[in-house]
Amino acid sequence: MSQTKTPLRGRLAARRSPDSGRLAGPGSLLTSDVGVVAPDAEGQLLAEYALEHGLRPSAQRPSVWAYIRQLWRRRYFMISFATARNVAMYTEAKLGQLWQVLTPLLNAGVYFLIFGLLLHINRGIPNYLGFLVTGVFVFNFTQRAFISTSSVMTDSLQLIRALQFPRASLPLAYVMIELQQMLLAVAVLIPILLLTGEPVTWYWLLAIPALLLQTIFNVGVGLLSARLGSQVNDFSQLLPFLMRTWLYVSGVLFSIATVSSNFKVVALLELNPAALYITLTRNALMATQRESAPGSKPYNKALCNIWHTLGHKKGAPEKYQTLSAYCHYVGANPAHFWYYAAGWAVLALVAGFWFFWRAETRYGRG
């Protein structure tokens, strides 16, 4: 025989309070006759009854794989959202979308004026303009992804509270916005490299996997930044200082390989993820970097001494600047840079996704 479900009213009556005291007043009644149910027990009973009839909490966190499938189904929404935000970002400016390219160009120009012409940090670095612009554009991609995602959850509270969707789609869409801007920056970077004498080679194709690894890394740190920004009120105040420090230790303005003779210092700086993606992109697009990197040619003490003596002088000919290739390499093994970059990308993606997913039901509350 099939088992019939007890009606909700019958269950509540079965769980009435065991209190047998009498109520004051004429015609006294036992509280057991009234059937009082403890509030906690009543809530638990209602939850059990709802589950039996197929009802589930609206803000229940899905499993990891179910969450990934939800994100994949919304991939077109994220692409459309990113494109629309990119178009709307500069609608009120007279130059419009040109600011997407002008902003990193102006930053690179300021850095070149200060560090290249005034402080002469460019000594010993062939094609310093191309070196600097490449570093600024690549670092700017990660920096903007980190900063923009830090406020995405608080800026989208109305959307989060009104609709049910995987919250990770918001920071992912913002990373897509920065990726679209990075592609525009690359379209500007290539003519600059050609004008500064860099040849077109098959090595340029290596910039594609370098950009892909950096994008994966940015997704991970974007998810991490999104949760921290939504739960730590002072996080947005700390970000400018963190980003400025990260800029100065990532080799954007100088060559890490020649900054110190201490192996541990150089290796630590080179294994910084931002520095890795910058180095991989420079080595892919700039022949001057591949040919002048210390250790790229057999060690020659005499030529290395000439580089240390003349290559750092202001206005030194490029033939002296490229002699650094004959010096010993100090730091991490350049042949392993791709492995390090891939490791950082996977680590950031897995850790960032798990960290964000754990708080899926908390976004939009407060």
Regions flagged by a language model, labelled:
Residues 2-18, 22-366:
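Hydrophobic transmembrane alpha-helices and immediately adjacent juxtamembrane helices
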